[in-house]
């Protein structure tokens, strides 16, 4: 299931254990059905050793992997708190760590404005683009912000989390217009930026700021992430880079 969370949110520990035992039966049944695939106990499940203790999991089957859902640059904290391997600090020994729900917000599927619910209830979009979050604003403002924060998050996670086993970013309903019509579906800007950010061989600049001033010194660390499928090494290379003004 998706984000049941009773192992965290149910204040009655004994009742939470009974619920977990029900899911454990499903895990064991799935191992019989297909023993070749790793199992995630629950979407967004991270083994709660602090609550139940390590000894509890010596005899309890809670699957094979941990799955950390996060909304960095959206609900959660800024991407600048993901530059030093913070994501992989949630890794438990012997258990691969993934995220199958990494998201940075929701353009709607028609105009590209942020989805109305988030504008009026959570108010996340206003933090990024102010009044342009509303229906009378320019949708390109939000699409550009969404493109930028999605790509920078993907690169930050790849730069600093070699112990992580994979990140799945929200894509279909957030990177495309008209997703319900194969004849008119059209990529939003985030799609094109993520082509680069998720390329097998990534060259990424770690920038601790978003405001750059003429004449100032720009401290920057360049990282090369090599996920080439054939496992080949990257030969000695030279990075050529420049700053380009959109205005």
Predicted regions, residues:
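Substrate-binding/catalytic cleft of secreted carbohydrate-active enzymes
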Residues: 1-186
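Intrinsically disordered, low-complexity segments enriched in polar/charged residues with Gly/Pro
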Residues: 26-27, 196-198, 228-229
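Short glycine/serine/proline-enriched coil/turn segments at secondary-structure junctions
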Residues: 75, 89, 213-214, 231-233
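Localized sequence-composition bias
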Residues: 175, 184, 190, 242-246
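Proline/serine/threonine-rich low-complexity linkers at boundaries of modular beta-sandwich domains
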Residues: 188-203
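Short beta-strand segments of immunoglobulin-like
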Residues: 207-212
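Beta-strand-rich binding/interaction modules
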Residues: 215-247
């Amino acid at each position: 299931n998706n984000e049941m969370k009773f192992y965290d949110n149910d204040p009655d520990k004994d009742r939470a254990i009974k619920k977990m035992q029900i899911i454990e039966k499903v895990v064991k049944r799935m191992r019989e059905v297909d023993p070749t695939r790793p199992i995630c106990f629950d979407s967004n499940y991270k083994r709660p050793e602090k609550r139940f203790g390590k000894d509890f999991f010596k005899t309890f089957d809670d699957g094979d992997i941990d799955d950390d859902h996060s909304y960095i640059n959206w609900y959660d904290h800024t991407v600048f708190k993901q530059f030093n391997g913070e994501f992989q600090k949630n890794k438990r020994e012997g258990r691969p760590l993934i995220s199958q729900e990494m998201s940075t917000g929701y353009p709607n599927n028609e105009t590209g404005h942020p989805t109305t619910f988030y504008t009026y209830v959570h108010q996340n979009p206003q933090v990024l683009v102010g009044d342009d979050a509303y229906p009378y604003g320019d949708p390109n403002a939000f699409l550009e912000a969404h493109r930028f924060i999605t790509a920078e998050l993907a690169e930050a996670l790849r730069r600093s989390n070699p112990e992580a086993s994979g990140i799945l970013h929200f894509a279909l309903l957030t990177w495309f217009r008209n997703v319900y019509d194969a004849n008119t579906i059209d990529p939003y800007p985030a799609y094109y930026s993520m082509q680069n950010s998720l390329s097998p061989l990534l060259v990424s600049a770690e920038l601790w700021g978003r405001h750059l001033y003429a004449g100032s010194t720009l401290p920057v660390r360049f990282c090369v992430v090599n996920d080439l499928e054939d496992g080949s090494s990257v030969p000695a290379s030279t990075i050529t880079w420049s700053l380009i003004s959109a205005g």
